């Protein structure tokens, strides 16, 4: 079965071409002049490192790993999370304000390396992949001031970052989504944005367009009592499936935080129920653990890689 990327995170071919030309320059111009009678590139292929990017893999607090961004990419993740604080004019990345360091910024840890990666991989974060990696920017400091700084910075990367103009999405290799202290009023008023808005379950049914709110995230423990031990109660399973269906019907992707993350059977049980329901992103600090689970237990990833699904543990 041919695997198709989530529609909301697939790069249109014209956007890919524009990105390649802008980022790679003369090399891309030469490539563009070559004959176009070759077969179309598959929707999803292995990267130059032999990895298939994992559609559901979200690196929670990614910056706490030994190699921020790069560890996640080496495990095939397609969504990474960075907490930011506006300090002395810099967007510093850390979980707590006391842990911020000058120079350890959104640009140095994420935007500049991603731009270089896209140049190296000829227009995509993963070679041959037509998707967009999600950069979830969790604003920890004052919302309006920090978003203004984030917006100024993202506009310096027009060929890297997805933008929305007049409600229309122009996909690029990286898509920023603002979480945490979100300045919804300013974001709503912008005619051109370089970031989407991370909604909550309370936003479902409000008619908010996916062009503004591409992602909905919420705290698992505030919605469900089940934490993976024993069978999932049928009422909670039905609730999860309803939430997924409602999110997808509106064009949103869905993520939960505060899910169990110790390497136990409870974590795998919760991940399996989430995959079965169609939750779009699984939240973890354990990069290797989630990669192993998705490559062996997720039918979507198994089909994409062309290998049989392993039996559940």
Label every model-predicted segment.
Residues 65-70:
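A structural motif detector for short, solvent-exposed N-terminal "entry" segments of globular domains
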Residues 2-3, 38-54, 71-74, 78, ...:
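Catalytic cores of phosphodiester-bond hydrolases, prominently lipid phosphodiesterases
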Residues 1-34:
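Secretory targeting and sorting signals
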Residues 61:
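Beta-loop motif signature
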